[in-house]
Amino acid sequence: MAKGKDVRVTIILECTSCVRNDIKKESAGISRYITQKNRHNTPSRLELRKFCPYCSKHTIHGEIKK
């Protein structure tokens, strides 16, 4: 039987360079990915390099709160 909360949680990854450029209004939008992570293996905030269609390059996408 499972104990406590679910181990796998759904998270949102957001492009960090689009968030910075959003202040200057240079970007057309903010790239976001939805994925899952294992809370026991990765207790800290997750950061992955993903493709951002608004920046047209691979950038760091960081985990955000819902």
Swiss-Prot record:
The parts of the chain that form a coiled coil are none
Q: What gene does the UniProt entry assign to this protein?
A: rpl33
Q: Which UniProt keywords apply?
A: Chloroplast, Plastid, Ribonucleoprotein, Ribosomal protein
Mostly located where?
plastid
Picking any one GO biological process from the record gives: translation
Keyword Ribonucleoprotein among UniProt keywords: yes
Query: What's one GO MF term for it?
Result: structural constituent of ribosome
Residue ranges of the TM segments: none
Cited InterPro entries: Ribosomal_bL33 (IPR001705), Ribosomal_bL33_CS (IPR018264), Ribosomal_bL33_sf (IPR038584), Ribosomal_zn-bd (IPR011332)
Write out the annotated subcellular location: Plastid, Chloroplast
- Here the disulfide bonds are none
One Gene Ontology cellular component term attached to this UniProt record is: ribonucleoprotein complex
Q: Print the organism lineage.
A: Eukaryota, Viridiplantae, Streptophyta, Embryophyta, Tracheophyta
The similarity annotation says: Belongs to the bacterial ribosomal protein bL33 family.
SUPFAM superfamilies, sorted = Zn-binding ribosomal proteins
- This protein is called Large ribosomal subunit protein bL33c
